Amino acid sequence: MQQVTIGSRTFSKILCGTNAFWGHSHFSEARNAEYRNRFDDRTIAGTIQRCLDAGVNTVESCANGRIVSILAQLRDTNRTSLHFVGSTRIDETSAMNSHQQKLSFLIEHRADICVIHAQYVDRPSSGDSIGGLDRMVDTIHEAGLLAGISTHRVETVERCERRGYGIDTYLFPLNLSGFVYPEYQGKETVQERIDVVRGVSKPFILVKVLAAGRIPPSEGLPFIAETAKPNDLISLGFGSEDEASESLSLAARLF
């Protein structure tokens, strides 16, 4: 498994994504319910363990106590480094209901990369700035951690680069179909997404690379291998332990 260094931290090229763990399928309510029923703490830990066994050393998730507890147990069991990329996404996984609360939680629990979620940075704005983002990035850096944002929009990446916010990495959707999430209203083309990823030297953490299960790994991962920069990371989610093993076996041949 290739590795990528950001700042003083070294991450596996592939990250373990967690949307399925929390019942976020971006497909249907029935699949959401199926995932919620399947993924108790033991099954989540088993799936992450499969990733660890395949050389993955990083988990990407929204901030919540459940994932922090599971990661702590896995660190104790494996006696190995296990990085955490945590976002301030506000959802049903936690009672925390503000991005500031989520950020404080991530800093307290030493998330290697603290990610300000698209819910915050993609909000409509009357000017070119993103209110409060500079202070949040400074707070993350003052804690000795890496700062990221997640965004669905090309224009948000371009805005952050123009404003010089000091962001270390961007979580950003890229796949061969252009899928972002159901009912997404943005008009970016796949080529425009590729252009911003390749045009910005900073590392991206590419998400939705299989379009939330709509693209087979045998098609989606080669596309990412051809389009991503050498310093970009890829977050992959899995619906089961065996699915993790299958996808990571293919990824190991590509990355």
Specify the residue positions occupied by each region the protein language model found.
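Beta/alpha (TIM)-barrel catalytic core signal, keyed to glycine-rich beta->alpha loops juxtaposed to Asp/Glu
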Residues: 90-95, 119-255
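Short, acidic/polar
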Residues: 33, 38-51, 94-107, 153-159, ...
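Structural preference for beta-strand elements that scaffold enzyme active sites
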Residues: 3-5, 11-15, 57-58, 81-85, ...
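N-terminal-biased segments
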Residues: 1-10, 88-101, 105-110, 149
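Active-site gating/metal-coordination segments in enzymes
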Residues: 99-128
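Acidic (Asp/Glu)-rich catalytic clusters
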Residues: 53, 70-81, 100-110, 161-165, ...
